Swiss-Prot record:
GO terms for biological process: DNA recombination; DNA repair. This is Holliday junction branch migration complex subunit RuvB. Belongs to the RuvB family. The gene is ruvB. Pfam families: AAA_lid_4, RuvB_C, RuvB_N. ATP binds at residues 36-37, 78, 81-83, 144-146, 187, 197, 234. GO terms for molecular function: ATP binding; ATP hydrolysis activity; four-way junction DNA binding; four-way junction helicase activity.
Length: 356
């Protein structure tokens, strides 16, 4: 199958605020990203440990013809939690209903979803850590006993009735597993942490996506896109589409190493995979706060970004690459960060720079 972006109306897309953000795109960009998602484990790349476990658990559930145990997927944004949930439903041969924690404001919102599930269906709740306490309370008996208690009527005439549900599988996704309440976390029988992808894994993803987009690309060009994608498939696919645009206008349509380098330089994505926001973050820590330790709120105010975005989107990759440390006293830039910006570490302080 070849995906043509002409199939999607892109005329009123809002401008991207940050190319390397792994946050979900606009609905129309999301439509293209959905078309690039693998549908089966056979097409799925990376997350070897989580994939192997899920394949075994799904195979066992299919063999016994019962609902898969509830699944919690957690990790930084853009690593494929939603994609995995679709694959789980597809491999189980059942339907999937999708929602998110903030959308489920009242118990009746969740009850409407649960009562419409068919036997062994999958219910996917993104940002499950943002469920309200009152909705979460309704979810507990549904997860354990496939039953919910709902109130009928109001005032003195109100009464509670118990409804039986079809067996189902809840797949919860979160970037902040630590914010889940213990009672909710304990009700997941399968917990999988998604890790950043290697450049080699991302190169395979980029190659597959280029084929679906009918975008000619050599191996070197694909690998250059992959290694600058912050270990994140969503970013890799987003960069691929922008590099393809550059190749069509400034080249002969083929994504080569030279085309990839020039396109990514135009997008301000450096060889380390950092963009302007990453460099702005490191510059704030090093130049404004003497390398740290500095609190998150101070950094957020300094660079004009929300604390939650910094924690979820910017910091994980910087920490994973060894450019930043989180300590009890605050954030500290590492020697690698100083070298990357071409700034000399404070004289006489290099040895103590990274003490916690």
């Amino acid at each position: 199958m070849t995906i043509q972006t002409d199939d999607f109306d892109m005329s009123d897309l809002p401008p991207a605020r940050r190319m390397l953000s792994a946050a979900p795109a606009s609905p129309k960009e999301e439509a293209i990203e959905r078309a690039l998602r693998p549908k089966l484990f056979d097409d799925y790349v990376g997350q070897t440990k989580a994939r192997e476990q899920l394949e075994i658990f799904i195979g066992a559930a299919n063999k016994r013809q019962e609902a898969l145990d509830h699944v919690l997927l957690f990790g930084p944004p853009g690593l494929g939690k939603t994609t995995l949930s679709h694959i789980i439903a597809h491999e189980l041969g059942v339907n999937m209903r999708s929602t998110s924690g903030p959308v489920l404001e009242k118990p009746k919102d969740l009850a409407a979803l649960l009562t419409n599930l068919e036997k062994n269906d999958v219910l996917f709740i993104d940002e499950i850590h943002r469920l309200s306490p009152v909705v979460e309370e309704i979810l507990y008996p549904a997860l354990e006993d496939y039953q919910i208690d709902i109130m009928i009527g109001e005032g003195p005439a109100a009464r509670s009735i118990k409804l039986d549900l079809q067996p189902f599988t809840l797949v919860g996704a979160t970037t902040r597993a630590g914010m889940l309440t213990n009672p909710l976390r304990d009700r997941f029988g399968i917990v999988a942490r998604l890790e950043f992808y290697t450049p080699e894994e991302l190169a395979r993803i980029v190659k597959r996506s280029a084929g679906l987009l009918n975008a000619p690309m050599d191996a070197e060009g694909g690998f250059e896109i992959a290694r600058r994608s912050r270990g994140t498939p969503r970013i890799a696919n987003r960069l691929l589409r922008r590099v393809r645009d550059y190749a069509d206008v400034k080249g002969n349509g083929t994504i080569t190493l030279d085309i990839a380098n020039r396109a990514l330089a135009m997008l301000d994505v450096d060889p380390q995979g950092f963009d302007l926001m990453d460099r702005k973050f490191l510059e704030a820590v090093i130049l404004r706060f003497d390398g740290g330790p500095v609190g998150l709120d101070n950094i957020a105010a300094s660079i004009g970004e929300e604390s939650g975005t910094i924690e979820d989107v910017i910091e994980p990759y910087l920490i994973q690459q060894g450019f930043l440390q989180r300590t009890p006293r605050g954030r500290i830039a590492t020697l690698a960060a100083y070298r990357h910006l071409g700034v000399a570490p404070p004289r006489g302080n290099a040895e103590n720079l990274f003490e916690e």
